[in-house]
Amino acid sequence: MSNYEIMILANPDSTLEQVSELLFSVLKKSDTKIEKLERSELAYPIHKLTRATYYLVTVKSDPQLMAELTRKLNIAKFILRSLIINLDSEKGLKPRKVKRFIPRAKNNDRSANQGDRRPFIRRNQTTDASKTEASTEATASKQSEQTTTKPRTRKVSKEQ
């Protein structure tokens, strides 16, 4: 025997007796609790109706009886929609893991955080002194070549 919760949207002209008669034709009265919730406006029309009455039913029953009840709810003309939830097998929401708050250091000095920082090193660079000297000489020669070339001049038209 499992616990079930049934939400029923019924025609607003239907009565509690009609709904309970339909439910008790399948279920036992001792294990069933019917609660009329409210009559409210629907978000969209169902069978050309814009209002419906909500019923909440809690039941302790066998799955075979719930299958029969589902069939009868689908056949009944005054039932607009129904939803059956097995409360025993429904997992529901799990609580979130809360991340712990770690406050920042109260000192806003940059010197306090210097121990955490590492200098940026390119992967191609090495610490060998001979290679660094060679690379500086190469860059110096490239710069001197760039300065020896003539700069481009823009032609200005005299028609302006």
From Swiss-Prot:
List, alphabetically, the Gene3D superfamilies matched. Answer: 3.30.70.60
Annotated signal peptide: none
- GO molecular-function term, one example from the UniProt record: structural constituent of ribosome
GO biological process assignments:
translation
Which SUPFAM superfamilies is this protein grouped with?
Ribosomal protein S6
Q: Which keywords does this chain's UniProt record carry?
A: Ribonucleoprotein, Ribosomal protein, RNA-binding, rRNA-binding
The region called Disordered is annotated at 96-160
Locate the compositionally biased regions of type Low complexity: 126-145
Domain of life of the native organism: Bacteria
InterPro entries from the entry? Ribosomal_bS6, Ribosomal_bS6_sf, Ribosomal_S6_plastid/chlpt, Transl_elong_EF1B/ribsomal_bS6
Cellular component terms (Gene Ontology): ribonucleoprotein complex; ribosome
Biased-composition ranges for Basic residues? 151-160
**Function noted in UniProt:** Binds together with bS18 to 16S ribosomal RNA.
NCBIfam families assigned to the protein according to its UniProt record, in alphabetical order: S6
Protein family membership:
Belongs to the bacterial ribosomal protein bS6 family.
Give the protein's recorded name.
Answer: Small ribosomal subunit protein bS6
The gene it comes from is rpsF
